[in-house]
């Protein structure tokens, strides 16, 4: 779609938000809440673990405790002899889920670039909701308890949940160009934290009726969200006849370049020929999806993936273990620990938005991330010595979330979109979902390993050594960032030198 030059100039003068339409807002909100619902279902499972554990173990503190009954009556519907065994199995389910989720991300990214992402996302949301219903609600209604069945269902749930992130990041990358992407994606990446809060609210509101209703409510809301995505989401501006974000940016660059050229020049013949061929060709060429190995070989993909594996291990360890750490280390009530842990998410939301905005202004991502990671080392050391004071703990926790959750949100969203739409693949290939799946899949492998290592270190040593382990992983993240900083700085100096020569 062609717009007059004067209209384009007026739109550029109106400011940053003038480039976006209500279609951009709809894509932003629909993808935001779709992934929030997927994350809410994960958080709901974490919030009902105590109730699930008590249901899976025999109870000797009820009204019939002193009535002699057969052993089958006491233990007929139980999976484990004690709460400790049930808790270990719940931890195993977390690890199984994350490994299945990591494997699924690699597959889902490839599928997302080859099929309609609206259909893939709808299928993932609705089918994942069904598995949640089967896992937590149907089994309880039927009084069916089986460890192998639970493991299989949770593996399937991890695979289905993995369809969400590559698709929503790719759709956002289609709608929002690199200009301002750091700020927009930094704000949008708060969807996971909002999902955590939503999941906690949904679970706590019906938990008094039984944990199965927490699964029922969460699954129902997620299934309804999948239906809304099917009928309401537009995956790309091209579906509405609008210019693609990459095309729009290239058009603006071409206009700026053309404005500096004379109307009559010696090299116009070749340009006229190429322009004529473009204008006369009205055939829309559908880009082919890039291969998995090709995506891995794109500049920056492997380094960012390895960096994210180390960083997501720390970030997800806070997600899974922070409430337990507060209860275990400071002897606070579980409900108070759950409420206090929200401050880590709040810090991550603010950190992702602010750091994304700064990276937009600098036009470089890796230096901003590296500075944040270096400050995260100090924040982790400070939080490991946090006093037994809730206000001070929440303050230091939010700072830690700012410097850890912020970079994590940026790598998984804005930087993944940058990598999938870089010049090497733009206009000829589709790589956004594949690259996002590679980055987040590698990160999820690191997160899954963390769920095994954190309790192992804590039981063998103490919580202080867990924080030393976190600091080591942050340092490893920084090491993987060094080549990226060198490359971005070299490119920045080259562009600055060329701009001076043009003047």
UniProtKB/Swiss-Prot annotation:
Glycans are attached at residues 62, 71, 275. Keywords: Endoplasmic reticulum, Glycoprotein, Lysosome, Membrane, Sugar transport, Transmembrane, Transmembrane helix, Transport. InterPro entries: MFS, MFS_dom, MFS_trans_sf, Sugar_P_transporter. Belongs to the major facilitator superfamily. Organophosphate:Pi antiporter (OPA) (TC 2.A.1.4) family. CDD domains: MFS_SLC37A3. It comes from Xenopus laevis (African clawed frog). This is Sugar phosphate exchanger 3. Unlike the other SLC37 members, seems to lack glucose-6-phosphate antiporter activity. GO terms for cellular component: endoplasmic reticulum membrane; lysosomal membrane. The chain crosses the membrane at residues 20-40, 87-107, 119-139, 152-172, 183-203, 214-234, 300-322, 342-362, 367-387, 395-415, 437-457, 466-486. It is found in: Endoplasmic reticulum membrane; Lysosome membrane. The keyword Membrane applies. It is a multi-pass membrane protein. SUPFAM superfamilies: MFS general substrate transporter (SSF103473). GO terms for molecular function: transmembrane transporter activity.
């Amino acid at each position: 779609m062609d717009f007059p030059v004067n209209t384009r100039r007026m739109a550029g003068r109106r400011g940053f938000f003038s480039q976006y339409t209500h279609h951009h807002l709809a894509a932003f909100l629909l993808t935001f809440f779709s992934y929030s619902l997927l994350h809410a279902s994960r958080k709901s499972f974490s919030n009902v673990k105590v109730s699930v554990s008590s249901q899976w173990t025999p109870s000797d503190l009820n009204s019939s405790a002193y009535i002699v009954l057969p052993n089958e009556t006491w233990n007929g519907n139980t999976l484990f002899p004690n709460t400790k065994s049930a808790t270990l199995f719940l931890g195993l389910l977390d690890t199984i889920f994350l490994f299945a989720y990591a494997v699924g991300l690699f597959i889902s990214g490839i599928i997302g670039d080859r099929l309609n992402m609206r259909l893939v996302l709808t299928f993932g949301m609705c089918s994942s909701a069904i598995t949640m219903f089967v896992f937590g609600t149907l089994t309880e209604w039927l009084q069916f308890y089986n460890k192998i069945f639970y493991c299989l269902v949770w593996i399937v749930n991890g695979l289905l949940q993995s369809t969400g992130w590559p698709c929503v990041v790719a759709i956002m990358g289609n709608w929002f160009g690199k200009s301002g992407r750091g700020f927009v994606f930094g704000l949008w990446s708060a969807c996971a934290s909002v999902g955590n809060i939503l999941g906690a609210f949904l679970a706590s509101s019906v938990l008094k009726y039984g944990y199965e209703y927490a699964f029922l409510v969460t699954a129902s809301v997620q299934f309804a969200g999948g239906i809304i995505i099917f009928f309401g989401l537009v995956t790309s501006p091209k579906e509405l006849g609008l210019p693609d974000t990459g095309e729009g940016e290239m058009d603006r660059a071409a206009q700026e370049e053309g404005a500096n050229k004379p109307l009559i020049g010696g090299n116009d013949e070749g340009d006229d020929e190429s322009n004529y061929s473009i204008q006369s060709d009205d055939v829309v060429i559908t880009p082919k999806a890039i291969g998995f190995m090709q995506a891995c070989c794109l500049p920056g993909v492997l380094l960012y993936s390895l960096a994210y594996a180390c960083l997501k291990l720390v970030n997800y360890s806070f997600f899974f273990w922070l409430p337990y750490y507060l209860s275990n280390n400071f002897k606070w009530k579980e409900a108070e620990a759950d409420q206090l842990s929200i401050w880590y998410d709040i810090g991550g939301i603010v950190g992702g938005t602010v750091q994304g905005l700064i990276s937009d202004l600098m036009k470089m991502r890796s230096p901003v991330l590296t500075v944040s990671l270096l400050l995260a080392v100090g924040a982790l050391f400070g939080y490991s010595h946090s006093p037994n004071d809730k206000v001070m703990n929440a303050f230091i926790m939010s700072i830690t979330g700012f410097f850890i959750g912020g970079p994590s949100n940026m790598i998984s969203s804005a930087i993944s979109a940058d990598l999938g739409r870089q010049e090497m693949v733009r206009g000829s290939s589709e790589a956004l979902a594949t690259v996002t799946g590679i980055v987040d899949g590698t990160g999820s492998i690191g997160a899954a390993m963390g769920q095994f290592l954190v309790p192992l270190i804590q039981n063998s040593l103490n919580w202080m050594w867990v924080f030393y382990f976190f600091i080591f992983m942050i340092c490893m993240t920084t090491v993987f960032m060094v080549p990226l900083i060198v490359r971005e700085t070299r490119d920045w100096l080259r562009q600055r030198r060329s701009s001076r020569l043009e003047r």
